[in-house]
């Protein structure tokens, strides 16, 4: 039996139910070529698919058709310009989470945060201090550290397996994020932070979409009967670990913004707001720990929260 051409292999993948982009990425990976080199496929669609690339591709097609994420098959996922290594030990970073990163960066640039960060040295640095809870692959923490190298970024996860992935990403990217194992804020270093960010589990136990996520770690996805269990815990404990005027930013489900804003307001946070993702969905919400800011600081923070996509409640 003759080897199929690359074009035939892509048609076979389509018949197996794969989308065109997924099939192209997996074929490039099987051939040992960069996954961004899709133009090469168009120029070589009549080339034969040799062994063992054919066997690798057919295996990946079958696994993708069974629901395994493309990122796990490739071993890599791009997030906020970073090429992160990922596997079944961690949740696949989603583009939606970049809305949380952009909001955090806007707050870190606000003069009010810079002034608070200069009040006292922490970890030998006068830059702002950031804590990422439930870091997983390290996506949020590493994106913030790369974009703001003067910040001191700590990251916590309860999973030793996830932390191994995150640490590997940090070493490979040369980013000095500090990692610690523990249960939310119980695992954080003994410090007060200017900014706490988190993309915690927020899917309800009975959510009908869960079967489609069966290949990803359930502990990173599911949070009780209404999906809010971990969000409640973080909101309740965060004020004790925030400096006066510090911010808490949380990713949540597409229909949870109102509930999360209510949790933040009930805990005494001010400037409570939500920010929309690229699809126009309120994807993350946050608030500011009450403190004694001056008038100009409030105005600076208002600009940071009111910029593109934010809805102030």
What are these regions (language model features)?
Residues 26, 67, 97, 140, ...:
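Residue-level signal for inorganic ion chemistry
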Residues 98-212:
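Conserved SAM/SAH cofactor-binding pocket of Class I
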Residues 28-107:
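Conserved AdoMet
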Residues 83, 152, 176-178, 270-273:
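Conserved beta-strand segments of alpha/beta enzyme cores
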Residues 1-41, 49:
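Non-catalytic accessory regions of SAM-dependent methyltransferases
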Residues 109-129, 290-313:
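Intrinsically disordered, low-complexity terminal tails and inter-domain linkers enriched
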Residues 200-230:
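Mobile active-site "lid"/loop adjacent to the S-adenosyl-L-methionine
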Residues 226-287:
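Conserved Class I SAM-dependent methyltransferase catalytic core
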């Amino acid at each position: 039996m003759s080897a199929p051409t690359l074009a035939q292999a892509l048609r076979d993948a389509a018949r197996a139910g794969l989308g065109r982009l997924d099939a192209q990425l997996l074929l490039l990976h099987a051939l040992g070529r960069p996954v961004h080199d899709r133009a090469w496929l168009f120029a070589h669609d009549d080339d034969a698919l040799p062994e063992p690339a054919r066997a690798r591709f057919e295996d990946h097609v079958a696994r993708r058709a069974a629901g395994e994420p493309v990122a796990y098959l490739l071993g890599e996922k791009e997030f906020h310009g970073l090429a992160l290594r990922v596997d079944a030990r961690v949740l696949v970073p989603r583009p939606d989470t970049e809305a949380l990163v952009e909001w955090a960066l806007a707050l870190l640039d606000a003069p009010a945060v810079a002034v608070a960060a200069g009040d006292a040295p922490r970890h030998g640095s006068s830059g702002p201090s950031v804590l990422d809870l439930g870091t997983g692959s390290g996506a949020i923490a590493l994106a913030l550290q790369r974009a703001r190298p003067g910040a001191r970024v700590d990251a916590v996860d309860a999973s030793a397996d996830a932390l191994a992935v995150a640490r590997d990403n940090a070493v490979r990217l040369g980013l000095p994020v500090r990692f610690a194992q523990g249960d939310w804020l119980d695992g954080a270093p003994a410090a007060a932070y200017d900014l706490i960010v988190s993309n915690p589990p927020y899917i309800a136990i009975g959510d009908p979409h869960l079967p489609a996520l069966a290949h990803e770690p359930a502990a990173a996805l599911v949070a009780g009967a209404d999906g809010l269990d971990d969000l409640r815990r973080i909101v309740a404990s965060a004020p004790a670990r925030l400096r006066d005027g510090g911010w808490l930013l949380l990713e949540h489900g597409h229909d949870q913004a109102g509930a999360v804003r209510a949790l933040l307001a009930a805990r005494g946070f001010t400037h409570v707001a939500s920010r929309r993702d690229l699809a126009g969905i309120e994807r993350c919400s946050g608030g500011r720990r009450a403190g004694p800011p001056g008038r100009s600081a409030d105005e600076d923070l208002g600009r940071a929260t009111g910029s593109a996509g934010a809805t102030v409640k």
